[in-house]
UniProtKB/Swiss-Prot annotation:
UniProt cross-references to SMART domains, sorted A to Z: Glyco_32 (SM00640)
The keyword rRNA-binding is assigned to this record: no
Name this protein carries in UniProt: Acid beta-fructofuranosidase 2, vacuolar
Native source organism of the sequence: Rosa hybrid cultivar
Role of this protein: Vacuolar invertase.
GO molecular function: beta-fructofuranosidase activity
Induction of the gene: Not regulated by light during bud burst.
Length: 640
């Protein structure tokens, strides 16, 4: 968006908003000299500490520790489940990603958080910042439930960056009568790159449920996009009976709104739409687009999180700014009845445009698949998926491509290559990678094409969910990897392809993940997930898997189909976790080539509420107490 030609109305009651445009400058420039000096002086002490003896990150506690803790076996299992490089708070419950953005050199991430326990409730906004989307620094809570209009929860919302570095945050508040209303907040000081203090607009709420909409069916405003009439436009999720809808509003000042006639889009039978996302993707470029961009080379993505089945669906289509309507390219795969972002545990997702690297980045909430009692016992629940870049798939023209942000590769340690490993039908091949708890796996599979061509045709409909999992053998599948497996294979999580030759000789490929034997525990969800994955002529079957303790994120064919899996093994943990290739097909062998990296842990520094009260944290104190140590760590981390 061209800020030089954009007209806008400043927010009232905030003096900085009416000031003249500032010359762009590097973030935290004023702190540069102080930071360098402190790094030099304190790194000597930090180096000594750093060079001291350290316990390996993935070893079983010693026997003496077990002797002193009668419940150590259970506690050890629960402790192992906590991830090493996925974002999560130190304790308690977390759900939806909120208001992600890049601002003055920092990535900001807000999230739904319960400061009182490991179950949903008492929802406020947590806040963390990062330089690279991998290493994080927790900050004080951004917003708490302290007003009549949000006393029952500061629910999901989105950030919009306006000209002159203005930021507006629209969020849903649950009132003292549990009515869902839309509220406005903005930073107390837009010059603070950490955005440590937020102000709620005194005239909140700015939107209430319109006539015909239920008081509990009006939530989750999107990032606003600028339209040619000099207004900003947002959409909000709702429903009418069983039809999921997205309401549309225009505003000039984010205080007064005009509701457009009709809706942006609606799909009968899909139920309540929440956490709507609406954004452009380029049909010709591998760069992301600002949310306000439109044009001939642009498609628009409409995504809704379906409250009925707790999955995220998207569709590609065309957006008409004048009518305020969006139309899907293919009604057979419309929102809620077609393609999902992810076929596993992935919900309430939210993208943002990263102007720093000209990319669109996707966050998604990864809930638990164990029991609530287990969550309470371990003291935490849920995490966020590794942020993903999102692009239009120019080859298929019908899919998005999702891929882990490139920064995750900074955590790669020692690498092992396996070239052209032959895996015969009905066999399992161990891969000697050491402890297989934290891995980044890139693999390609080559089937025997003669066998594929001669395979019998079948009219049988295949579904990952109803196929019987990796134990069900077919002529051309399943085959892939056994992740988080123990030596005896009593616990394993297969991530695999299944190829079906249909009538007329068409070959369809499915990508699945099977939890049914992931754990001998009985209080966890065990199901098979996955879907069809487009494989074009001449393409090799490929996948990437990120393994991080209790989460497995899998990407097929460059990210056309993805599956996020939560697993809770009791034996395939710590040093007992292994990795295998497997081929459970009856008629074909395959050749696999793999690159596998051990992964380091991310640095996620907690915020301690005991260190100071929320009100005493200024940009300077936050910098001294948290940013300086954070910088020291990163310096040591990348030079070792």
């Amino acid at each position: 968006m061209d800020t030089n030609t954009t007209s806008y109305t400043p927010l009232p009651g905030d003096p900085f908003l009416s000031g003249p445009p500032e010359t762009p400058r590097r973030p935290l420039k004023g702190f540069a000299v102080i930071f360098a000096s402190v790094i030099f002086l304190m790194s000597l002490v930090a180096l000594i500490i750093h060079q001291g003896p350290q316990q390996p990150p993935d070893v079983m506690p010693d026997k003496q520790d077990e002797h002193h803790h009668p419940q150590s076996t259970t506690n050890t299992m629960l402790s192992w489940q906590r991830t090493a490089f996925h974002f999560q708070p130190e304790k308690n419950w977390m759900n939806d990603p909120n208001g992600p953005m890049y601002y003055k050199g920092w990535y900001h991430f807000f999230y739904q958080y319960n400061p009182r326990g490991a179950v949903w409730g008492n929802i406020v906004w947590g806040h963390a910042v990062s330089r690279d989307l991998i290493h994080w620094l927790h900050l004080p809570l951004a917003m708490v439930a302290d007003q009549w209009y949000d006393i029952n929860g500061v629910w999901t919302g989105s950030a919009t960056i306006l000209p002159n570095d203005q930021i507006v945050m629209l969020y849903t508040g649950s009132t003292n009568e549990s009515v869902q209303v839309q509220c406005l907040a903005y930073p107390a000081d837009h010059k603070d790159p950490l955005l440590t203090k937020w102000v709620k607009y005194s005239g909140n709420p700015v939107l209430v449920p319109p006539p015909g909409i239920g008081v509990k069916d009006f939530r989750d405003p999107t990032t606003a996009w600028y339209i040619t009439e000099g207004k900003w436009r947002i959409t909000i999720g709702s429903k009418v009976n069983k039809t999921g809808i997205s309401l549309v509003y225009d505003t000039k000042d984010f205080i007064k709104y005009e509701q457009l006639d009709g809706v942006l889009h609606a799909v009968p039978g899909t139920g309540m739409w929440e956490c709507i996302d609406f954004y452009p993707v380029s049909k010709t470029s591998d760069k992301g687009l600002d949310t306000s961009q439109n044009g001939a080379d642009v498609k628009h993505v409409m995504k809704a999180s379906l409250d009925d089945d707790r999955n995220d669906y998207y569709a590609l289509g065309s957006y008409n700014e004048k009518t305020g309507k969006w139309v899907p390219d293919n009604q057979k795969i419309d929102v809620g009845i077609g393609i999902r972002y992810d076929y596993g545990k992935f919900y309430a997702s939210k993208t943002f445009y990263d102007q720093n690297k000209q990319r669109r980045v996707l966050w998604g909430w990864i809930g638990e698949s164990d029991s609530e009692n287990a969550d309470v016992k371990k003291g935490w629940a849920s995490l966020q998926g590794i942020p993903r870049t999102v692009l239009f798939d120019q080859k298929t023209g019908s899919n998005l491509l999702q891929w882990p942000v490139e920064e995750i590769e900074k955590l790669r340690l020692n690498k092992k290559n396996f070239d052209k490993v032959q895996v015969k039908a009905g066999s399992v091949v161990p891969l000697d990678v050491g402890t297989a708890t934290q891995l980044d796996i890139v693999a390609e599979f080559q089937l025997d094409q003669k066998v594929v061509e001669s395979a019998a045709e079948t009219n049988e409909e295949f579904s990952c969910q109803t196929s019987g999992g990796a134990a069900k053998r077919g002529a051309l599948g399943p085959f892939g990897l056994l992740v988080l497996a123990d030596d005896s294979l009593s616990e394993r999580t297969p991530v695999y392809f299944y190829v079906v030759k249909g009538s007329g000789g068409t070959v369809n490929t499915y990508f699945c993940a099977d939890q049914t034997r992931s754990s001998v525990a009985t209080d966890v969800v065990k199901q098979v997930s996955g879907s069809y994955v487009p494989v074009l002529k001449g393409e090799t079957l490929s996948l990437r898997i990120l393994v991080d303790h209790s989460i497995i994120e899998s990407f097929a064919q460059g990210g056309r189909t993805t599956i996020t899996t939560r697993v809770y093994p009791t034996q395939a943990i710590y040093g007992a976790a292994r990795l295998f290739l497997f081929n459970n097909a009856t008629d074909t062998s395959f050749t696999a080539s793999l690159q596998i990296w051990q992964m380091n842990s991310a640095f996620i520094r907690p915020f301690s509420p005991d260190a100071a009260s929320h009100s005493s944290f200024t940009p300077v104190t936050v910098f001294i107490k948290f940013i300086v140590p954070f910088g020291i760590f990163l310096t040591l981390y990348f030079v070792r």
